């Protein structure tokens, strides 16, 4: 939905009330749930542990040796963000996107049942057993693309006491339009280069904002080539 809104030309935005539609989109995401038991449970499981976030970028395939070596050496909690990655065994999955969540349920039901699943409250059709956390607890306004799943997962980890986070597959969109962006080709899209650059800029800005507010308390590292 957000990508559709952002791809509309200024002329079309003046003709139709798309700015109001964007406000409605943000309000729709805001479904409040009692997530205190979930936060407390994951604080007990994860606080003080190393965590590896597997974003869906293509480097999960092209740099898989580096990722597997990191997992073998560091023994982190492995979390798939907005996807169930091939060739990696995850301890947990984090979803902030309804379409990606449903795709995972439909195509990887066994993995979704085996591991812990964390879902933000904007995802409405949640299966029994998923751990729902408040979208607005993890989303921060001030950017066009404020609902990036990896950034939201990072904020979740900070709130449950994780102080050592590594990223893999956190690639961003490539400068060359023809290059694959995702480890799973199903997720490929035809966004304009202008829109891809804007998304990259927002994600980088949100990451820097996290670091500024965190004041260096959380160790961040990148296992694969990144933004």
Description of each model-found segment:
Residues 1-227:
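Metal-ion/cofactor- or nucleotide/acyl-coenzyme-handling active-site neighborhoods
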């Amino acid at each position: 939905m957000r990508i559709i809104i952002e791809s509309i030309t200024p002329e079309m935005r003046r003709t139709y009330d798309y700015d109001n539609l964007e406000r409605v989109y943000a309000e729709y995401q805001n479904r409040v749930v009692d997530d205190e038991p979930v936060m407390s449970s994951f604080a007990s499981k994860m606080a003080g542990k190393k965590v590896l976030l597997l974003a869906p970028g293509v480097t999960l395939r092209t740099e898989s040796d580096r990722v597997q070596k990191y997992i073998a050496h560091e023994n982190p909690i492995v979390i798939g963000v907005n996807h169930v990655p091939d060739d990696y065994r995850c301890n947990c999955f984090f979803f902030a996107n309804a379409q990606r969540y449903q795709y995972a349920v439909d195509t990887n039901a066994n993995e979704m049942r085996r591991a812990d699943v964390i879902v933000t409250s904007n995802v409405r059709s949640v299966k029994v057993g998923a751990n729902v956390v408040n979208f607005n607890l993890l989303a921060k306004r001030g950017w066009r693309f404020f609902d990036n799943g990896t950034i939201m997962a990072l904020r979740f980890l900070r709130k449950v006491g994780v102080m050592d986070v590594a990223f893999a597959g956190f690639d961003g969109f490539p400068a060359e339009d023809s290059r694959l962006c995702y480890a799973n080709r199903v997720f490929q899209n035809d966004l304009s280069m202008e829109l891809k650059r804007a998304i990259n800029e927002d994600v980088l800005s949100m990451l820097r904002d996290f670091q500024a507010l965190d004041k260096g308390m959380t160790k961040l590292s990148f296992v694969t080539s990144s933004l």
